Amino acid sequence: MLDNTRLRIAIQKSGRLSEDSRELLSRCGIKVNLHTQRLIALAENMPIDILRVRDDDIPGLVMDGVVDLGIIGENVLEEELLSRRAQGEDPRYFTLRRLDFGGCRLSLATPVDEAWNGPAALDGKRIATSYPHLLKRYLDQKGISFKSCLLNGSVEVAPRAGLADAICDLVSTGATLEANGLREVEVIYRSKACLIQRDGEMADAKQQLIDRLLTRIQGVIQARESKYIMMHAPTERLEEVVALLPGAERPTILPLAGDKQRVAMHMVSSETLFWETMEKLKALGASSILVLPIEKMME
């Protein structure tokens, strides 16, 4: 039986978000072995239990109060929310923050040889999908009637198999659609992973742990989005150098031994430093330009 004094977090056991979720928890300093097949893994250094489950079970576990937190794709979360509302329920939860992984889009796709003049082309058609409620909401808003063909996998083969006229499925690169003679015609929902919390009273110790975890997650995401930049720059062109780095904080300026014409500049930039920018910095007289990843960051 689970210990209710420990924070319970549900993550995807395997699939699109699994590896990124494990990496996030690890970078937040949670020491736990998630490479076994166990359903529940206990953290060694914090009162945290990690439940590894199917992704479409995570929203329900949070909404029903079985776990305290869940890392889940917004598409799966929204589908479960709409499903429960359709059954007359009033599901409750909090979205603590959007995460920086798991990006995808839910799109309509039709056979490549069929004309497309907008969603109206689907009126009265049969559409295969694993997301019937998201699809219904979108087409209801457009005033379009359709027949739903619910499939839990291999949705892209439905038109070729004669099961449906079109599909509504997750798309990342579009390669799978192309391989099955389909083309993406309309994006109906964009999704990323998010961290959600159950509704209801939370023990003070648990809430404090959640707040600590949120601070660490923010630091991990900021670190991944930032770079530490060091260079030597001519003193008379410092403002021009800084202007080339719009995402950077004001730099730390250090003197160079025996060189009064140049200084050492250190700064954190929240924007990617492209080769073109580095070439422009060099043209301004900058040298010894280093762009380094940041492991941890806290403001």
Curated annotation (Swiss-Prot):
GO terms for cellular component: cytoplasm. Transmembrane segments: none annotated. One of its GO terms (biological process) is L-histidine biosynthetic process. Its EC number is 2.4.2.17. Feedback inhibited by histidine. Keywords: Amino-acid biosynthesis, ATP-binding, Cytoplasm, Glycosyltransferase, Histidine biosynthesis, Magnesium, Metal-binding, Nucleotide-binding, Transferase. InterPro entries: ATP-PRT_HisG_long, ATP_PRibTrfase_cat, ATP_PRibTrfase_CS, ATP_PRibTrfase_HisG, HisG_C, N-reg_PII-like_a/b, N-reg_PII/ATP_PRibTrfase_C. Its cofactor is Mg(2+). It holds the Pfam family HisG. One of its GO terms (molecular function) is ATP phosphoribosyltransferase activity. The keyword Metal-binding applies. The keyword Cell inner membrane does not apply. Belongs to the ATP phosphoribosyltransferase family. Long subfamily. Equilibrium between an active dimeric form, an inactive hexameric form and higher aggregates. Interconversion between the various forms is largely reversible and is influenced by the natural substrates and inhibitors of the enzyme. This is ATP phosphoribosyltransferase. It comes from Klebsiella pneumoniae subsp. pneumoniae (strain ATCC 700721 / MGH 78578). The lineage of its organism: Bacteria, Pseudomonadati, Pseudomonadota, Gammaproteobacteria, Enterobacterales.
